């Protein structure tokens, strides 16, 4: 078990959406294969949440813009003396390939949105207890089909997200690795700094401190207030060391 815990906080709406998409796709993959009612509901609930997030904006356009922006950044890095040119070229190729695949793919989420079973389950999830067998006989039948049939259908659903997921994974890896962790110290539970056009804050705390950060701000400036997990009996030290990366 790790002695430290990592917190990530988006500094703009674009990054907030991307982190939610990443989280939901991870949740969808967590309990596969689907072999029982509970894991099915976990999967379909996350599919519904993912479609809700995707429908709020033009995810593909934002990802394509970011893929292009990352290519320009790498072009600048390529001119730095002593840089690993092979590594730069490899990442640039991945960015170009991901952009080509994403541009050629259907609208993000369209395949899931048009699926009849997903649509039926999505409607019933908003009703407390609305996914009983008498409410959703189609799901009841689906869960009694062979595991191979269910696996094949889930594979198609997950595969439809792959162009977006590949682009998103590549972008988030580059963002997360764009800045190192540096030791910082908060005074009386408070810390603030300039964002320097960052998209994402990454913060590491000792698990033994039993503290969590409340973060507010945007790409230009941010503030962090540390709060005790036990709000009644916990306390925050006058000086607290932590690790911070502005990515």
UniProtKB/Swiss-Prot annotation:
Q: Which Gene3D superfamilies match?
A: YacF-like, YacF-like domains
Location relative to the cell: Cytoplasm
A Gene Ontology biological process noted in the UniProt record is:
FtsZ-dependent cytokinesis
Q: Transmembrane ranges? A: none
Q: Which GO terms describe its cellular component?
A: cell division site; cytoplasm
Query: Which Pfam families does the record match to this protein?
Result: ZapD
Keywords in alphabetical order:
Cell cycle, Cell division, Cytoplasm, Septation
What InterPro entries has UniProt attached to this entry? ZapD, ZapD_C, ZapD_sf
Q: Which family does it belong to?
A: Belongs to the ZapD family.
Describe its function: Cell division factor that enhances FtsZ-ring assembly. Directly interacts with FtsZ and promotes bundling of FtsZ protofilaments, with a reduction in FtsZ GTPase activity.
Assembly description: Interacts with FtsZ.
Tell me which NCBIfam families the record gives: PRK05287.1-1, PRK05287.1-3
Task: Indicate what this protein is called per its UniProt record.
Answer: Cell division protein ZapD
The organism encoding this protein is Enterobacter sp. (strain 638)
Gene that specifies this protein: zapD
């Amino acid at each position: 078990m790790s002695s430290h815990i990592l917190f990530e906080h988006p500094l703009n709406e674009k990054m907030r959406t991307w982190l939610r998409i990443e989280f939901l796709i991870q949740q969808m993959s967590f309990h596969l294969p689907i072999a029982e009612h509970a894991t099915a509901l976990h999967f379909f609930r996350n599919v519904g949440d993912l479609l809700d997030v995707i429908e709020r904006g033009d995810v593909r356009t934002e990802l394509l813009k970011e893929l292009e922006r990352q290519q320009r950044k790498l072009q600048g890095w390529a001119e730095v003396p002593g840089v690993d040119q092979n590594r730069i070229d490899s990442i640039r190729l991945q960015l170009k390939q991901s952009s080509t695949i994403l541009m050629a793919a259907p609208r993000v989420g369209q395949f899931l949105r048009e699926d009849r079973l997903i649509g039926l389950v999505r409607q019933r999830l908003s009703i407390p207890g609305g996914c009983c067998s008498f409410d959703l006989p189609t799901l009841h039948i689906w869960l009694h089909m062979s595991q191979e049939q269910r696996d094949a259908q889930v594979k198609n659903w997950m595969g439809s997200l792959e162009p977006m997921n590949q682009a998103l994974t590549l972008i988030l890896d580059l963002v997360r690795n764009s800045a190192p962790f540096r030791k910082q110290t908060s005074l009386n539970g408070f810390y603030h700094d300039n964002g320097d056009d960052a998209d994402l804050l990454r913060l590491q705390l000792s698990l033994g401190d039993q503290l969590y950060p409340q973060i507010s701000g945007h790409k230009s400036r941010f503030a962090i207030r540390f709060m005790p997990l036990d709000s009644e009996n916990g306390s925050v030290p006058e000086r607290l060391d932590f690790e911070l990366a502005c990515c």
